[in-house]
Amino acid sequence: MVSETPEDAIVSRPEAQGCVFGVDEAGRGPLAGPVVAAAVVLGDAYPKGLDDSKKLTAKRRAVLDEDIRKTCGWGVGVVDVEEIDTLNILGATMRAMSLAVQGLAAKLGGDPDMVLIDGNLTPHGRCDLWQWEAQAIIGGDGIEPAISAASIVAKEWRDRIMTEAAQDYPEYGWLSNKGYGTAQHLEALRLHGPTPLHRRSFAPVAQQELFR
């Protein structure tokens, strides 16, 4: 997080009206795998107990993910490693968010009146796909239910991608670390080098490339 609060960020829950999408991302920090964003519009019977995905147990998160996708409108945007290395991780995250909102709007047959985004930045002016009114909320995944739901869907979606990828590259420990730079992952990078799913624009991966 930057040291200053940008003009497009607030620190409290807004009084949004009309059709409101919540948006959050998963996977900005890992050394491998895509960045994933989800957009969610809550249904009338949305699941109770929504919270920041990082505060939930894996079991509870999986149950909520299934319930959200059954009772709410949702869309997912996935930006792969090649685009991350081309755009940088911020640009890739903004693109994933844009794709998620675009996908959900297409499902619903109409645009949202407002998009609430976890964090301190919106894709407005940062991604050419973005065309919706948006508000960034610092800590929004813990205070705005639609964002909480999006954080859960994004996290579970990305975890499934990395669990599948771990079958092809078991040495890197992706079943447990999901691509983050744990000691096991860094040691595997040193021994085996980067895979096609590694982010070569990230320093620990780039350093291993230099020595191979």
Swiss-Prot record:
Disulfide cysteine pairs (residue numbers): none
GO MF annotation list: manganese ion binding; RNA binding; RNA-DNA hybrid ribonuclease activity
Cofactor(s) essential for the protein: Mn(2+); Mg(2+)
GO biological process, one term: DNA replication, removal of RNA primer
Sequence ranges assigned to domain RNase H type-2 in this UniProt record: 18-212
Cited CDD domains: RNase_HII_bacteria_HII_like (cd07182)
Pfam short name (any one): RNase_HII
Keywords recorded for this protein, A-Z: Cytoplasm, Endonuclease, Hydrolase, Manganese, Metal-binding, Nuclease
Subcellular location: Cytoplasm
EC number: 3.1.26.4
Entry note: cofactor: Manganese or magnesium. Binds 1 divalent metal ion per monomer in the absence of substrate. May bind a second metal ion after substrate binding.
Residues bound to a divalent metal cation: 24-25, 118
Functional description taken from the UniProt entry: Endonuclease that specifically degrades the RNA of RNA-DNA hybrids.
PANTHER family: RIBONUCLEASE H2 SUBUNIT A, RIBONUCLEASE HII
Designated name of the protein: Ribonuclease HII
Organism: Erythrobacter litoralis (strain HTCC2594)
Gene: rnhB
